[in-house]
Amino acid sequence: MNKQEWIDKCNHWKTKWPVMQKEYEADDSDTPLNLYAVLDAVNKYSGRDDIIMGDAGSISYAGPVALNRKYDQRFVFSPAQADMGWAVPASIGVALSSNDKNVIAITGDGSFMSNVQELSVIRHHCLNIKILILNNRGYLSIKNTQEKYFENRVYGTSDKTGLEFPVFSKLAESFSIPYYLIKNKGDYENGVFYGLDRLQHIFAIEGPVIVNCICLENQEILPSQALKNGKQAGLHDMAPFLSDEELQEEMVVTL
């Protein structure tokens, strides 16, 4: 297989198994936002030379596959260290050295709290940073680990198991940073629309903004490695699993 054949094969897989599925789209229900719908909106409304920062947790798994880097965009994250709270302080350095480009820092509610003091630096320098909080009301990655590998003994990962978060709107107000709440497609508050399409307006604002995206508490990160018949499957065979026939058909080498 030559280079072009490999590229064609990869594009075939991207078309056959798109990351963004129809059922992930926001709707008029009370269901929280799907993480992939939020990232799809970032793809749609981010600028051609925006710099996107990814924190640890859900965004570090979903971001590399769901974000479609375009034109001169950059996606910067720290997967090797996976340190919670990295995105906000890192975005400060990027903003100060990028000639006032728009910086989009995507973080979880747990990671955001790890370096919340950096908001004072962002406000003081009026940095052009948009902080998107993927608010799943806790430590989703830690909770998933506890459920999968510790027989569902979950502790310290949500308000139900000993973890509390502040009211983010009041936190933003205390730093004099504009705040937006995004719940679902049909959400209105005081006559103002707060759906994901609101990101088009938010990304055009000069200066810092905090955006609180209310997301699913039990978000599945797909595709992912999982136990298959009691054994860890390989990177070529990830959940949701294909049939043996389809897997063999799509492989470029013989199993």
Predicted features by range, described:
Residues W6, T31-N34, V167, N184:
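A diffuse structural propensity rather than consistent per-protein peaks
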